[in-house]
């Protein structure tokens, strides 16, 4: 990346995972914002948070990741943010549904260490930036 701090909104209903990923992304020059679930993330976006990346779980109470993506799209919240799923759901139908809702990447939690997640997010972001320059 270009040394500039990227803003990331991490959305999960597991406080331990939120803290762990917040630390890892902070150590890698990200400005980190967290939300405990889809509802809180939508509230933050409506309040004016404009992250470069939204990293979200799919399995959450109240509003799951799919509902969150639908709301982000319908209400045109943070339309330029790169949306990435980080979930234990690994069925092809879930990946296709998320892709159809506009995610740029899909990371399976169980097969990725926290630092691998950071590296994959950076890779997805860099690929998106390169594609926009073409």
Locations of regions flagged by a protein language model:
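Non-catalytic signal-transmission and effector/linker regions of two-component phosphorelay proteins
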Residues: 1-7, 114-134
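Charged docking surfaces used in two-component/phosphorelay signaling
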Residues: 19-27
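Helix N-cap/capping motif at the beta->alpha junctions
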Residues: 34-43, 65
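Short amphipathic alpha-helix used as the core "switch/output" element in two-component signaling
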Residues: 43, 66-79
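Active-site beta3 strand of CheY-like receiver
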Residues: 49-55
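Active-site residues of response regulator receiver
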Residues: 57, 87
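Receiver (REC) domain active-site loop signature in two-component systems and cognate sites
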Residues: 60
